[in-house]
Amino acid sequence: CIVDAVAGGGYFHYAGDFNDQQINFYQYANAFVKNGGSFSWATDLGSGFVNSYSFYLLGSPFFWLSMVVPARLMPWAMVPLLCLKMAVAGGGGYLWARRWVRDETWSMLAGCLYAFSGFSIYNIFFNHFLDVVALFPYMLAALDDAVIDDKKGAFPFWVALNLVDNYFFFAGQAVFLIIYFFCMAAGRRYEL
């Protein structure tokens, strides 16, 4: 992200939905929220702001963090946000893997492989996909903590954050968590 931005004179060069939608959504939503709007005449033929933008960014902690940046600077803030999402994803992958490996080097490798997986790199132009990738391993690690260590406090938080972040992707995450739970129980990693 940073190398491309420096080489491109401060711009992250990417074509398609990233330029046509994602940057514009962030910039528009940033200004809209700061101006206290509720109904957007600029979206489609006019639409409720929450209806239109909840799938893309309204539940994203990364979007709310971007509110410290003026709307006019959002195109340049996208590179640091992408880097932050990758770092958070890598940290989550590391956190989850740390429990399951003997050598911490492997958990660091797992974090890097997770953050820079083919899915993440390919779907970089769908900026909101990376929010889901960044937050999911924390929910998975919190499930392990809840079942194995009886530390249940973090799990509802991460479930709620992932749900609010993107309700559509959460359906898949919930199915995966259920399968993961039963596989861990069947493999006797979870003592029930």
Residues of each region from the PLM?
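Membrane-interface coil-to-helix junctions
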Residues: 1-90, 112-134
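Membrane-embedded helix bundles of polyisoprenyl
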Residues: 83, 87-99, 105-187
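Membrane-interfacial entry segments at the cytosolic side of transmembrane helices
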Residues: 189-192
